[in-house]
Amino acid sequence: PNIEMEKISRPMSDWDYVYWGAPVSENIYSQIPGFLDKRYRWQSGTATGSWQNLGTTLPGQGFITRIADVAPFNVTPTAINFTMKGTANNGYVYVNVDSYDSSSIIYGNAILLSNPYPCAIDAATFLDHPNNTELGGTFSFWTSFTPISTSNPGPDTYNYNEADYATWNRTGGTGTKASTDTTGNDSLRPTGKIASGQGFFVHAFADGQIEFDNSMRLVSNVNTQFFRTSQNALANLEPEKHRFWLNFKDNSIAFRQMLVG
């Protein structure tokens, strides 16, 4: 069926990046809002990998966009509204992947994928699929929590903070900011329920095809974790496990979270 799916981000500022994916089969490049001035895809397969200009969106492949230095984003943090229109993806979705080697946790083995469906998918079911055995077990989600800064390490004058990748594996998720309530719902911590339109990194240790199918799709109300500042409680439901989180923070914005399980 034809759909119109609106994705609403948490409040964001100029220069922030958002990781997306198309829930429809058509190329939605022309639908990207004009204030998102930089648009890239990730090219794996070399030792370092590289960002390439985006020209076409494909189901299951992630892409990123940057917010331009324009109002209202350069005045006050504002949510992004991105409406994606087209034929909803359904059934099998295959993504060709190119790895650098069979074992290294390096940029060249990282692949940028996305949930190809207009509903959430379960990360564990995705990993368990017999055609996805070449994948590593950790997913990385960009939160864009730390402002771009000259104090962040990197090759440019102003750089982003790599610690802004929240992660999830079978033990659980680690966030990028300290929770301000007792539930932890606003800690930007992934739950393993990947929302529609969400792009993410995972490592691949062999060339081939990654497969998505309908067995991974979730039909209950868990399609909410697109890294807003306030999460729906249902999106944070996880199986009971024996584990605990250690938060390390200082009086500035610096924060690290460690999961032990």
Q: Each predicted region: which residue ranges?
A:
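Compositionally biased Ser/Thr/Gly- and acidic/asparagine-rich
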Residues: 69-261
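Self-processing/autoproteolytic domain segments and adjacent N-terminal interaction modules in large
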Residues: 1-101, 243-261
